[in-house]
């Protein structure tokens, strides 16, 4: 019997693949555990349409990330902090503080997407990479100022 796998099934294949399996295995295991559906022409069409929608959504997400990258790279993010003599910052500027500054500017970016190799410990301008999408990385200009 031909089935369309809904999820990855060990020993059978990955989600979305059409596989030929024994009738009893299909009925007693795959269908009961909702791991697969029978590969009828209607189900094949529905699955193809679902895949197309997922691809379109992924493409739209990528385009949105590229647009956001263009906007962010034109901005300078100002972060104020206490500093001592010689431009040394008390403590450090972390990704959370940068995310909060972005939020106050109207951008919603998770602090985990800001890829600081190490916290910023000096006043001035610093370039900080932000991973917006697995294919899109923006570079922020962060200006650390004395409060």
Swiss-Prot record:
UniProt xrefs under Pfam families: Ribosomal_L9_C, Ribosomal_L9_N
Keyword field: Ribonucleoprotein, Ribosomal protein, RNA-binding, rRNA-binding
Xref: SUPFAM superfamilies: L9 N-domain-like, Ribosomal protein L9 C-domain
GO CC terms of this entry: ribonucleoprotein complex; ribosome
GO MF terms held by the record: rRNA binding; structural constituent of ribosome
Keyword Ribosomal protein: yes
Coiled coil residues, start to end: none
An annotated GO BP: translation
Superkingdom in the source lineage: Bacteria
Family assignment from sequence similarity: Belongs to the bacterial ribosomal protein bL9 family.
Free-text function comment from the UniProt entry: Binds to the 23S rRNA.
Xref: NCBIfam families: L9
Name the UniProt record assigns to this protein: Large ribosomal subunit protein bL9
Gene: rplI
């Amino acid at each position: 019997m031909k089935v369309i796998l809904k999820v990855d099934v060990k020993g059978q294949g990955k989600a979305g693949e059409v596989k030929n399996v024994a009738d009893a295995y299909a009925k007693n295991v795959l269908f009961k555990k909702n791991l697969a559906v029978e590969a009828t022409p209607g189900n094949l069409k529905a699955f193809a349409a679902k895949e197309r929608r997922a691809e379109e959504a992924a493409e739209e997400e990528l385009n949105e990330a590229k647009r956001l990258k263009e906007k962010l790279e034109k901005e300078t993010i100002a972060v104020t902090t206490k500093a001592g003599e010689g431009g040394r910052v008390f403590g450090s500027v972390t990704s959370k503080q940068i995310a909060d500054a972005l939020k106050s500017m109207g951008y919603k970016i998770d602090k985990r997407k800001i890829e600081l190799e190490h916290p910023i410990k000096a006043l001035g301008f610093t370039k900080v990479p932000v991973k917006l999408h697995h294919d899109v990385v923006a570079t922020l200009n962060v200006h650390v100022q004395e409060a």
